[in-house]
């Protein structure tokens, strides 16, 4: 199974690739957590000069949060939003805040569908 996010450092550049092209690179909680950790690493490493984010595939940069999966989880549990769904949105907004205040250049290679949380992780 492919990783849903690919994080690497090449030539002093942090590179984030959202790797869920079959889901238009929609964000999961795992992606949000890994992006948060990677941005912390990049910001605190003087050898890293900037960060680039891109989406895999040809249709989308990022369609936002994977609300289909969150909806299914809520329906499966038969009630109001779960702790995980609330934590997802809380942490995703914190990620947007981190990107907004990031101390190094943050470059989004937007190509294709970009909406909701995709806008947040691309240009906050």
Where are these predicted regions, by residue range?
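Conserved CoA-thioester-binding segment of acyl-CoA-metabolizing enzymes
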Residues: 1-54, 97
């Amino acid at each position: 199974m492919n990783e849903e996010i690919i994080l690497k450092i090449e030539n002093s550049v942090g590179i984030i690739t959202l790797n869920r092209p079959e889901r238009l690179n929609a964000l999961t909680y795992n992606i949000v957590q890994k992006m948060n950790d990677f941005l912390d690493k990049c910001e605190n490493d003087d050898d890293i000069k900037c960060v680039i984010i891109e989406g895999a595939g040809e249709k989308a940069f990022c369609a936002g949060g994977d609300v289909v999966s969150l909806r299914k989880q809520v329906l499966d549990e038969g009630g109001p939003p779960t702790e995980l769904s609330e934590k997802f949105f809380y942490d995703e907004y914190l990620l947007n805040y981190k990107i907004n205040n990031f101390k190094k250049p943050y470059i989004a290679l937007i190509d294709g569908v970009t909406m909701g949380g995709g806008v947040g992780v691309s240009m906050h």
